[in-house]
């Protein structure tokens, strides 16, 4: 193969790798966002169920009162 042909193949490989990497990053962001929402819902349920009668040191009152925004 000539030098130009090798350079063209190199550019195609770099382009293909970039496109695949970009698409997989976008897909994983969506999955991570969904996982974060599920995790926060789970934490809210656990805190709601196991809310102590007296606040735990470092825990804000709004967590048990469901007024946190």
From Swiss-Prot:
Keyword vocabulary terms for this entry: Acetylcholine receptor inhibiting toxin, Disulfide bond, Ion channel impairing toxin, Neurotoxin, Postsynaptic neurotoxin, Secreted, Signal, Toxin
One function term, GO molecular function aspect: toxin activity
GO annotation, biological process: venom-mediated perturbation of signal transduction in another organism
Recorded superkingdom: Eukaryota
Coiled coil: none
Subcellular location: Secreted
Signal peptide coordinates: 1-21
Pfam families the UniProt entry points to: Toxin_8
SS bond list: 51-64, 62-68
Cleaved propeptide residues: 22-49
InterPro entries: Conotoxin_a-typ
Tissue expression from the record: Expressed by the venom duct.
Annotated GO CC locations: extracellular region; host cell postsynaptic membrane
Role noted for this protein: Alpha-conotoxins act on postsynaptic membranes, they bind to the nicotinic acetylcholine receptors (nAChR) and thus inhibit them. At 1 uM, the synthetic peptide reversibly blocks mammalian nAChR alpha-1-beta-1-gamma-delta/CHRNA1-CHRNB1-CHRNG-CHRND and, to a lesser degree, alpha-6/alpha-3-beta-2 (CHRNA6/CHRNA3-CHRNB2). At 10 uM, it reversibly blocks nAChR alpha-3-beta-2/CHRNA3-CHRNB2. In vivo, intramuscular injection of 10-20 ug of the synthetic peptide in goldfish causes death, while intravenous injection of the same doses in mice causes unconsciousness.
Miscellaneous section: Negative results: has no effect on nAChR alpha-7/CHRNA7, when tested at 1 uM. Also has no effect on nAChR alpha-3-beta-4/CHRNA3-CHRNB4, alpha-4-beta-2/CHRNA4-CHRNB2, alpha-4-beta-4/CHRNA4-CHRNB4 and alpha-6/alpha-3-beta-4 (CHRNA6/CHRNA3-CHRNB4) (at 10 uM). Does not inhibit potassium channels.
Similarity comment: family membership: Belongs to the conotoxin A superfamily.
Entry domain remark: The cysteine framework is XIV (C-C-C-C).
Protein name: Alpha-conotoxin Pu14.1
């Amino acid at each position: 193969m000539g030098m130009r042909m090798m350079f063209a193949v190199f550019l195609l490989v770099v382009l293909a790798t970039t496109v695949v990497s970009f698409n997989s990053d976008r897909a994983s962001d969506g999955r991570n966002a969904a996982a974060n929402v599920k995790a926060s819902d789970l934490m809210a349920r656990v805190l709601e169920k196991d809310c102590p009668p007296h606040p735990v040191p470092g825990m804000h009152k709004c967590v048990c009162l469901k007024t946190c925004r």
